[in-house]
């Protein structure tokens, strides 16, 4: 019997903002086959499909610490500042975040508008 069998997916992670879906093999802070790694938040994790190394993994996402919706770690969907926050919650509570985060969010706004405009233009 082969003891190096791939872990079976536990379920499917789906970002409630962008719709990203991927099978995850673990949810928590200490992924299997990792010796000294502890993630700072409960996360949806999958084995890294790009390497045979069992200790390598990808963090797909987590739950927003305010609204509890599942969000991916993509910069368009969430940010981590002591905890995971979805961008809608960050924007709703922007004044509660440090100035550095507020400035970072201001920088993100023009980019997202450009992306939206490009998507609309590509349809016509």
UniProtKB/Swiss-Prot annotation:
Pfam families: C6_DPF (PF10170)
Top-rank taxon, per record: Eukaryota
Biased composition (Basic residues): 115-124
Region of interest (Disordered), ranges: 105-124
Coiled-coil segments on the chain, per record: none
Database matches in PANTHER family: CYSTEINE-RICH DPF MOTIF DOMAIN-CONTAINING PROTEIN 1, CYSTEINE-RICH PDF MOTIF DOMAIN-CONTAINING PROTEIN 1
Assigned protein family: Belongs to the CDPF1 family.
Protein name: Cysteine-rich DPF motif domain-containing protein 1
Gene assigned in the entry: CDPF1
């Amino acid at each position: 019997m082969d003891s190096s069998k791939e872990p079976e997916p536990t379920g499917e992670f789906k970002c409630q903002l962008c719709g990203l879906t991927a099978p995850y093999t673990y949810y928590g802070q200490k992924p299997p086959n990792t010796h000294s790694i502890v993630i700072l938040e409960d996360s949806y994790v999958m084995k890294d499909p790009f390497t045979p190394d069992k200790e390598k993994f990808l963090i797909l996402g987590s739950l927003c610490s305010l609204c509890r919706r599942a969000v991916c770690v993509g910069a368009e969907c969430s940010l981590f500042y002591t905890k995971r926050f979805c961008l809608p919650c960050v924007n709703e509570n922007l004044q509660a975040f440090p100035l550095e985060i507020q400035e970072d969010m201001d920088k993100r706004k023009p980019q997202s508008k450009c992306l939206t405009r490009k998507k609309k233009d590509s349809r016509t």
